[in-house]
Regions:
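Residue-level recognition of membrane-helix boundary sites in multi-pass small-molecule transporters
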Residues: 6-7, 99-102, 160, 175-178
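Transmembrane helix-loop junctions in multi-pass membrane proteins
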Residues: 1-6, 121-132, 167, 174
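Membrane-water interface regions at transmembrane-helix termini and the short interhelical loops
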Residues: 1-15, 89-96, 167
Length: 183
């Protein structure tokens, strides 16, 4: 229990749950606080200077031109997920086919939720944090946590827990990569 594959799996599960709760809760609270003031998401996007009609359309670029090549190439990203060494080793550890079915469903659900809500965070960030539109876009999740939990809710302890979720993502990947490279 103190090391090896089992320890990595246990810590990855705990860190993964922290990340999942954070990536689901933070944008939902931010959306609530955005819409409580009477602002809609599309109105917030328009106020931020983004062309909201094209911003929410997957087939258009920001300037209105077609984006089909970007969409097709973006679909290829999902194929690389199953070849990642730290993911592949988890599937190799499955005991039988019944567990493999559950493992696949869990992995697909995790990826769909995490990536879907990551996109939602990016879209919501333009409306909820308009000061980041032309600045530090990579800080959108951190700034969203700070605004929701320290400004709106006055709960800095919860903000700290969700900020730890970012560190959990880093540590989870690092220990999985170390395990794969050491074996």
């Amino acid at each position: 229990f103190l090391g090896g594959f089992t320890a990595v799996c246990v810590t990855d599960f705990i860190q993964g749950m922290l990340m999942l709760v954070g990536i689901l809760a933070v944008p939902l609270f931010a959306y609530h606080f955005l819409t409580t003031g009477g602002t809609t998401l599309s109105a917030g996007l328009e106020a931020s200077g983004a062309d909201s009609a094209n911003f929410l359309n997957l087939m258009k670029n920001g300037d209105g031109s077609n984006n089909i090549i970007s969409v097709i190439s973006g679909l290829g990203w999902g194929l690389g997920y199953f070849g990642m060494p730290h993911i592949l080793v988890r599937f190799m550890a499955v005991r039988d086919e019944k567990e493999m079915t559950k493992s696949k469903a869990t992995a697909i659900s995790w990826v769909a939720l995490s990536l879907g809500f990551a996109v939602f965070i990016g879209i919501l960030g333009r409306a909820y944090l308009p000061e980041l539109v032309n600045g530090n876009n990579e800080k959108v999740f951190i700034e969203m946590i700070k605004k929701v939990f320290t400004v709106e809710m006055r709960a800095p302890f919860i903000a700290g827990l969700f900020l730890c979720g970012i560190l959990a993502a880093i540590m989870s990947t690092a220990d999985s990569q170390l395990l794969v490279s050491a074996s």
